């Protein structure tokens, strides 16, 4: 009986020691080790990485390969890691460079952490951002091309979700932590959406991100099954014509090209497997696109005064011979398109309904606008 009690007491002591060590963590800056128990699989995205360490620490690689060591607030950063910056999490004040960032933070339930943006109030369609700017809680920090670094310093955010063209030396000089976001370089629309996991790491909202992402992937797979066995894939032209009459077309190895394919279309542009956009002449655009069945302009044409196909042709007469123009099959973005990355699955469904309207009777288009002929 005594022996049994001693064994029970011994086990109890061991459990207590384990709990004390596990939850207390290192009192000083120790060496954090990889902790696979908190790992979340990145299935599609290739432009960021997250390594989960012990004691709530994370080593994040941003869009340009910078290493960011995320550590719980009040905890001494662990030793033994090469990092460009240390950022305390969860972050409370952030600045968003791109319109694609706030919708993902909204999904995570942390959109109120945004205190600065680089898009003017009148251009936003997210109520939380518009109201925040109206009340002065969210500040405008200059245009998307040139950030107002003095205002940024005054805000003193926990992290600036920045673009790859930011003046990094200036940010370092001002002591502003930043993480570079390059979701637009991903080769798959689901990879872009998976950047929600990148942002989640800064807020400890991984489970919310994972659950949301799984639902979106499931929706896209359901759509893919609906489009199985298609005999005819319409030829799709996708390109933005500038005032200089040059055209930007997504290259073959881009999320746009794959999104068209996922929606049951055939992208007419060809070339080497490269990312980004190709800048071509209007004449080259004509050769690629004159026989396309559908033309999608990745812009909000009515904002430029182009409210009909007739007005589009009046500005660019070379388009008059396009099959898509003659058939009245010209589409453009709704103003809120770029703020809808969280609706990627719905956007792909919109495209599928444009390409194959017979499969989607009564579909209401939410992210694309069909230009009237006159």
Region spans (language model):
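N-terminal hydrophobic or amphipathic helices and topogenic motifs
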Residues: 2, 10, 25-90, 360-374
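Extracytoplasmic ligand-binding site segments that recognize negatively charged/polar headgroups
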Residues: 101, 117-128, 168, 181-198, ...
């Amino acid at each position: 009986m005594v022996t049994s009690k001693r064994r029970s007491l011994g086990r109890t002591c061991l459990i207590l020691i384990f709990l004390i060590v596990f939850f207390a963590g290192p009192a000083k800056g120790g060496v954090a080790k990889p902790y696979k128990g908190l790992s979340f699989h990145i299935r599609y995205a290739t432009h960021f990485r997250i390594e989960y360490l012990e004691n709530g620490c994370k080593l994040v690689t941003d869009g340009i390969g910078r290493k960011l060591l995320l550590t719980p607030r009040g905890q001494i950063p662990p030793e033994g890691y090469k990092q460009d910056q240390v950022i305390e999490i969860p972050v409370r004040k952030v600045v968003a460079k791109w319109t694609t960032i706030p919708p993902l933070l909204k999904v995570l339930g942390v959109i109120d952490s945004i205190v600065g943006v680089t898009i003017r109030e009148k251009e936003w369609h997210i109520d939380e951002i518009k109201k925040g700017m109206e009340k002065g809680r969210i500040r405008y920090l200059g245009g998307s091309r040139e950030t107002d670094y003095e205002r940024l310093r005054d805000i003193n955010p926990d992290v600036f979700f920045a673009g790859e063209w930011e003046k990094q030396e200036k940010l370092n000089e001002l002591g502003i932590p930043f993480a570079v976001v390059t979701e637009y370089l991903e080769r798959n629309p689901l990879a872009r959406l998976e950047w929600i996991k990148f942002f989640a790491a800064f807020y400890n909202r991984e489970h919310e991100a994972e659950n949301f992402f799984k639902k979106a992937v499931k929706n896209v797979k359901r759509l893919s099954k609906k489009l199985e066995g298609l005999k005819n894939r319409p030829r799709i032209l996708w390109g933005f014509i500038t005032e200089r009459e040059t055209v930007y077309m997504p290259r073959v190895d881009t999320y746009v090209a794959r999104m068209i394919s996922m929606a049951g279309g055939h992208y007419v542009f060809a070339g080497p497997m490269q990312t980004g956009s190709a800048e071509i002449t209007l004449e080259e655009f004509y050769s690629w696109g004159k026989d396309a069945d559908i033309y999608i302009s990745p812009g909000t044409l009515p904002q430029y005064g182009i409210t009909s196909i007739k007005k589009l042709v009046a500005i660019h007469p070379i388009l008059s011979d396009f099959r898509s123009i003659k058939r009245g099959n010209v589409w453009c973005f709704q103003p809120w398109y770029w703020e809808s990355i969280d609706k990627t699955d719905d956007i792909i469904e919109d495209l599928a309904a444009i390409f194959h309207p017979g499969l989607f009777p009564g579909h209401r288009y939410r992210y694309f606008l069909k230009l009237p002929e006159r």
